């Protein structure tokens, strides 16, 4: 069997940026069209070539295909997003590192400082939102293409991945348990698989709902 080459830095960067957007805000009508577009299908096909990502990509493809059968799919997805990520009850999956006891408080602020980044004033969510971690990883992967700072950026990438993996499995498990239609559950499983693949732990199994 021919081994597929690992993802390029630019591919990681684009995928992290795409996932950051999906976990940050509800999918609007335009976003729904994009999800079902040939462009996204091609991106998923690229990811699917990696054996460690194939199962989670296939699941997300199924959930995207199922959206065409869902009446008022955009409104339903918005309701799913709200129920999972904006509510504070026990049936949610809050996307904030501080909600998980495994995470050291304020870690993301230190990581951003090391990267020379600041959160935009227009960002109204707490700094430890999942989307900030993913935007940081996107930035770091783009920066890895610049040889003069490659070693420093790679070290910071590893620190960011390790920090994220302290709480991302529990977040993913919460999505699996509390997302009845499964789109965000599948999306979170793909994210976890990509982060583990990026971290060199692609052999670890995806968490399963209890």
From Swiss-Prot:
- Kindly state which keywords UniProt assigns to this record, in alphabetical order: Chaperone, Cytoplasm
Report the subcellular localization: Cytoplasm
Gene3D superfamilies named in the record: 1.20.120.1820, HscB, C-terminal domain
Classify the main location.
cytoplasm
* A GO term from the CC aspect: cytoplasm
**GO BP term, pick one:** protein complex oligomerization
Role description: Involved in the biogenesis of TorA. Acts on TorA before the insertion of the molybdenum cofactor and, as a result, probably favors a conformation of the apoenzyme that is competent for acquiring the cofactor.
What the entry lists under NCBIfam families is as follows: PRK04976.1
Similarity remark: Belongs to the TorD/DmsD family. TorD subfamily.
Q: What is this protein identified as?
A: Chaperone protein TorD
Report the source organism. Salmonella typhimurium (strain LT2 / SGSC1412 / ATCC 700720)
């Amino acid at each position: 069997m021919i081994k597929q080459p690992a993802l390029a830095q630019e591919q990681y960067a684009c995928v992290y940026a795409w996932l950051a957007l999906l976990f940050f805000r509800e999918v609007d009508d335009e976003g729904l069209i994009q999800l079902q577009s040939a462009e996204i299908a091609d991106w998923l096909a690229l990811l699917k070539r990696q054996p460690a990502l194939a199962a989670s990509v296939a699941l997300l493809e199924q959930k995207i295909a199922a959206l065409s059968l869902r009446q008022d799919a955009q409104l339903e997805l918005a309701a799913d997003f709200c129920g999972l990520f904006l509510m504070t009850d026990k049936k949610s999956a809050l996307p904030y590192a501080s909600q998980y006891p495994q995470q050291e408080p304020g870690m993301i602020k230190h990581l951003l400082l090391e990267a020379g980044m600041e959160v935009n004033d227009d960002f109204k969510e707490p700094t430890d939102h999942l989307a900030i971690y993913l935007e940081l990883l996107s930035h770091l992967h783009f920066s890895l293409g610049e040889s003069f700072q490659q070693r420093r950026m790679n070290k910071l990438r590893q620190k960011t991945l390790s920090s994220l993996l302290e709480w991302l499995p529990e977040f993913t498990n919460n999505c699996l348990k509390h997302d009845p239609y499964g789109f965000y559950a599948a999306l979170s499983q793909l994210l976890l698989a990509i982060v583990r693949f990026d971290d060199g732990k692609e052999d670890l199994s995806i968490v399963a709902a209890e």
